[in-house]
Amino acid sequence: MYYCISFTHKNTDIALREKLSFSNEAKKSEFLKIISTHENIEECLVISTCNRVEIVAFVKMACAEFIVKSLALLCDVDKDILLEKADIFEDSGAIHHLFSVASSLDSLVVGETQIAGQLKDAFAFAVKNNFCGVHLSRAVHSAFKCAAKVRNETQISKNSISVASVAVAKAKELADLTQKKAVVIGAGEMGELAAKHLIAAGAKVIILNRDLQKAKDLCERLGVLSEYDSLENLKKYLNQYEFFFSATNAPNAIITNSLVEELSYKRYFFDIAVPRDIDINENENISVFAVDDLEIVVQKNLALREQEARMAYGIIGRETSEFFRYLNDLALMPIIKAIRLQAKEYADKQLEIALKKGYLKKSDKEEARKLIHQVFKAFLHTPTVNLKHLQGKMQSDTVINAMRYVFDLQNNLEGLNQYKCEFDMENNDEIY
């Protein structure tokens, strides 16, 4: 069954989320290797962003305690606290949650489109490292289809905002950014988003990054209203400008009290990183806004999107039902075919026995074959119709398993791929 363990801004604070975050691929790989050794876990992937850690898996049976214990040990967090905080979803609930995440209905900023790229990256990493197979591939691709349908059929992503844009919006409330210089620390996706929103607000940006070439490349994309420098010169910039937006993947705070001097003018620090980049004392001239603080601004946008969100949840509900209907269809049709094939084989076998024993003339063989086939087709007609009527219904799994047992079909369904995937595992590409 599908399984999901979720830690988000809804059930954990930023201090706990930053401990759980997977800031590098090595840590993510280590965790997935650990949990994939469990006998009940067949496939798994991890989505890790500033606002969430999602463990998505395909399992034989529930194993939340093992997964959470593994996460707690790796991240040095109390297991009982994690179990208490975790939202756990099973099967249809897990798929509905995954579709909601992909469609940005579960985001801090409803309608932001960043999560689709983050899910794609998480999926690609899991596929590349052999943690993800056909089960999760089918689910993730269906999640992408659902997200596209939500975007196309609602206005949920119109004028969409991210945490970075919320930070810039908050800065605009504090001062006119026109012609001001703002320092963006980090040249990754979140840093780039912040820089773009700042430029759109009329500000000029200075990109600071450990990798100078990456900062230069970002400035080339941003255009003439940007410049760049090495993160080594951070202290100089911290004590020269007013607005700072920090979005690095550093494991520890990079802006500390030792770097920030007392100045006569106000400075505003926006920490949009998880783990947090900024650990300084606030005073009358220094204000710090972390990810959770920005939720206040986010709330102002939620009312505007409430109606669209209701429409989107309707789509997600229908797509979740359709997903399981499709899986049931994939399972039922080969069983119907296998039963008919089994009946045909038995009929042909008995016909040959009758011919050998002289119960039937060779000249009557074809007519007898037609008659026998018509009989078993007529006999199987009602069971076939009833099986088809089960498609998409809750009891279908029970009936499918019963039919496999009764007709001894366990080893006769090699052609059945219940979780048919639309992802080329060799080339990491879609094969629609």
From Swiss-Prot:
| UniProt free text on domains | Possesses an unusual extended V-shaped dimeric structure with each monomer consisting of three distinct domains arranged along a curved 'spinal' alpha-helix. The N-terminal catalytic domain specifically recognizes the glutamate moiety of the substrate. The second domain is the NADPH-binding domain, and the third C-terminal domain is responsible for dimerization.
Q: Which Pfam families match?
A: GlutR_dimer, GlutR_N, Shikimate_DH
Which biological process annotations from GO are given for this protein? Answer: protoporphyrinogen IX biosynthetic process from glutamate
Q: In which pathway does it act?
A: Porphyrin-containing compound metabolism; protoporphyrin-IX biosynthesis; 5-aminolevulinate from L-glutamyl-tRNA(Glu): step 1/2
**Quaternary context:** Homodimer.
Instruction: Give the miscellaneous note.
Output: During catalysis, the active site Cys acts as a nucleophile attacking the alpha-carbonyl group of tRNA-bound glutamate with the formation of a thioester intermediate between enzyme and glutamate, and the concomitant release of tRNA(Glu). The thioester intermediate is finally reduced by direct hydride transfer from NADPH, to form the product GSA.
Its biological purpose is as follows:
Catalyzes the NADPH-dependent reduction of glutamyl-tRNA(Glu) to glutamate 1-semialdehyde (GSA).
Chain positions recorded as substrate binding sites: T49, C50, N51, R52, S107, E112, T113, Q114, Q118
* Keyword terms of this UniProt record: NADP, Oxidoreductase, Porphyrin biosynthesis
Question: What is the designated name of this protein?
Answer: Glutamyl-tRNA reductase
Look up the domain of life of the source.
Bacteria
Per the UniProt record, which EC number(s) apply here? 1.2.1.70
Question: GO terms for molecular function, please?
Answer: glutamyl-tRNA reductase activity; NADP binding
Query: What is this enzyme's catalytic activity, as reactions?
Result: (S)-4-amino-5-oxopentanoate + tRNA(Glu) + NADP(+) = L-glutamyl-tRNA(Glu) + NADPH + H(+)
Q: Which residues form the signal peptide?
A: none
Catalytic residues (positions)? C50
